[in-house]
């Protein structure tokens, strides 16, 4: 089930960055984990590989499309992170 969040509360500075992924919750070793998915090609995303990240708009389109069965959206922190 998709958790409710308020898109308007996400800072524009974050929305402008191409650092977004979707995730699916999976039971791994008895614990629920968030598995990051590249919204552009549905492959696994990597926290250390910017080529596997996407724009906010692309990630939102995938999140809202029930055929992809995503559980949420995640912002990947990069070396240039300056938000407080």
List each language-model region with its residue ranges:
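Conserved phosphate/metal-binding and DNA-contacting active-site motifs used
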Residues: 1-84
